[in-house]
Design a protein with these regions (language model features):
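Catalytic cores of nucleotide-sugar-dependent glycosyltransferases that transfer UDP/GDP/TDP-activated
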Residues: 1-237
């Protein structure tokens, strides 16, 4: 099968450090190639893949903009979709797998070939009006619980995020501390994780880049460097 993978342009695929969606898109792409499919990955420059790589821009948008600025990336998102749709019209693809988010999902009905969208994030408050217009497009949920946020969408399957077991070693015995691995932002629930650590009396290490400086300042007094410590952004190693 000839498959187009549409990855976000924020980070390289796979990411050097933070980039959950980019990591999952990379894992799926590499496994599809191993299965013998003809895969084309649309992503930013600097990405590394065994599939055919189409560089939509020469470097990550996060580096170009100096952070996440969603209004500024919309033009490049639609440029990526246009490139994929044009290639699909030329017969290059049998299917398109969208990892770019919910706005792109709404274009599913005008795609030259079948398109499926995996939603890797929570649903924004203003998603419902748009999504109802595209409720008959094809979606993959990352958990059955996620479906409850928009039960009216046309879900094809639930596919949980996977990991490379050769990179993340399983240990039967638990450690002596909690680990919080996510961006330092309100939507990730950092404050709730700290509350759990405080209530259980366990130490907690927090790792991830700070995407909301204002919010981070509100939790900073709770980080004492002993029970609660912040170690910054980390990679898979």
């Amino acid at each position: 099968m000839k498959i187009a993978m549409l990855a976000p342009l924020w980070k390289t695929v796979p990411p050097q450090k933070y980039g959950g969606t980019e990591l999952v898109a990379s894992l799926i792409t590499e496994e599809l190639v191993k299965l013998g499919h003809e895969v084309t990955l649309f992503a930013c420059g600097g990405s590394n893949t065994s599939a055919k790589l189409v560089e939509v821009i020469d470097r990550p948008m996060y580096d170009i903009l100096g952070g996440f600025k969603f209004d500024a990336i919309q033009f490049y998102d639609f440029m990526e979709v246009k490139m994929a749709f044009d290639a699909a019209k030329a017969g290059d693809f049998d299917i398109i797998h969208n990892h770019m988010g919910l706005a792109i999902a709404a274009l599913g009905n005008i795609s030259p070939v079948p398109m499926i969208t995996t939603n890797h994030s929570s649903l924004p408050p203003d998603f419902e009006p748009l999504s109802r217009l595209a409720s008959d497009c094809n979606y993959i949920s990352i958990s059955d619980s996620q479906r409850s946020m928009a039960p009216y969408l046309n879900y094809i399957a639930t596919v949980y995020h996977g990991i490379r077991t050769d990179q993340i070693e399983f240990k039967a015995d638990s450690g002596d501390y909690l680990l919080f691995l996510a961006t330092m932002s309100e939507q990730k629930g950092v404050d709730r994780a700290i509350e759990i650590a405080k209530r259980t009396g366990m130490k907690m290490k927090m790792a991830g880049n700070i995407t909301d400086e204002k919010y981070f300042e509100t939790i900073k007094p709770l980080i004492d460097g002993e029970q609660i410590s912040y170690i910054g952004e980390v990679d898979l190693q």
